[in-house]
Amino acid sequence: GFEEIRGPVVELAFWNFDALFQPQDHPARDMHDTFYLDQPRIGQLPEDLVEKVKNVHETGGSTGSLGWKYLWKREEAEKLVLRTHTTATTIRYLAEHPDPPIKVFSVDRIYRNEKVDWKHLAEFHQIEGIVMDKGVCFRDLIGLIREFYSRLGLKDVKFRPSYFPYTEPSAEAVVYLRDKNTWLELIGMGIFRPEVTQPLGVKYPVLAWGGGLERLALALYNLEDIRAFYFNDLRWIRNISNIYLEKKIGMT
């Protein structure tokens, strides 16, 4: 089975970005995407990992990669942010537990400086997990995620190639929303790159995935707007179980 883990809401940019091989000039690190703290502004870096992560960013280290070919700045990694994904939690855990087998998950709040609309929130919950073991592969990851959605009763889920700075190969799972005639991204997934795992001393493949809980519920409960979860509509709340049951047994 899986073990549940938790992590801090206020996080070092080091864990939120740098340890995940996300370059310091990446657009996601800009203030229009990420909430940075004014006070306190900086935190304490894990000194045993700083030089290893720095080398991977600048030259690729001994991974065979060329890195990002820029001058990595300690002061950027020291900044404190409201975590933008719970991958910061799983990468912290992986740094402390580099040996297999590992099967952990997290369901927790994250924050993004985004324009709010029918499928985006500035504060929401993310479902996150990793599996690390000898011989695991991308096919195992696809099977795990497919089984997860199947047991929830979601139909019309498919996988398509994607890109994330910290996984390769990468994919996303999407579900078709008939009422909106569109595909909605549910989860991003992939295998952690060597530039992520090697500085942590991890020697085996790590399957990783993460996606919004509210988006999953949006698909499960036939909602038109993700903001409905925070409207406190008692009539809708009382009817949730019926909506889900109808969808689970194929009545919708």
Which ranges hold each PLM region?
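TRNA-recognition modules of translation machinery and tRNA-sensing kinases, especially anticodon-binding
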Residues: 1-252
